[in-house]
A protein has these predicted regions:
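Residues at helix-coil transition
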Residues: 22-23, 64, 123, 130
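Hydrophobic ligand-binding cavity/cleft-lining segments
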Residues: 1-36, 151-152
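A conserved amphipathic terminal alpha-helix motif
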Residues: 103-152
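Short, hydrophobic secondary-structure boundary micro-motifs
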Residues: 29-30, 39, 136-139
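Hydrophobic pocket/interface hotspot
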Residues: 17-18, 27, 45, 59, ...
Length: 152
């Protein structure tokens, strides 16, 4: 099984970063406005990106102010059964976000694309947390949808 791992240094308060990865108000700023998100174990978060993607993520771990983990409930793609975790820590003037997606089938063409997508999403999260700039990666014309459409 393959793992995707990103460690992002963010010049923002730890609570702001944690809110951005656990609340609907946070996600609409950096991923997609078409989402339903709740920071509660057992809740199924839903994220839609145009007509190309619909992700269903069950919250399986929530450590307030520190970590959240999801299990992907999608039935039809390489994300099915994978787990995504976000861990937030502080060191000096930075808050670090460690993001992992585990359980991917392997390092193939799809793996490279998923890794690219996460890089785009997390860069958007960093911009939002540091500058307060809304940069919805899942918005029309964001590049991710164009890349997804180009793959079909």
């Amino acid at each position: 099984m393959a793992i995707i791992y990103h460690r992002i240094p963010i010049r923002a308060d730890k609570s702001k970063v944690f809110e951005a990865i656990t609340t609907q108000e946070g996600f609409v700023q950096w991923w997609t406005s078409d989402c339903v998100v709740k920071p509660a174990v057992g809740f199924i978060n839903e994220f839609r990106i145009g007509t190309e993607a619909h992700y269903r993520m069950k919250v399986i771990l929530l450590q307030p102010g520190r970590a959240v983990e999801w299990k992907c409930l999608n039935q039809h793609d390489d994300w099915s059964g994978t787990q995504v975790s976000f861990v937030v820590t502080e060191k000096g003037e930075y808050t670090y976000l460690d993001m992992k997606q585990t359980g991917l089938s392997g390092e193939n063409e799809e793996y490279g694309f998923i890794n690219y997508q996460w890089g785009q999403y997390l860069a958007s999260l960093k911009r939002f947390c540091e500058a307060g700039t809304k940069n919805e990666v899942g918005a029309a014309g964001s590049g991710v949808i164009a890349v997804t459409a180009a793959r079909n």
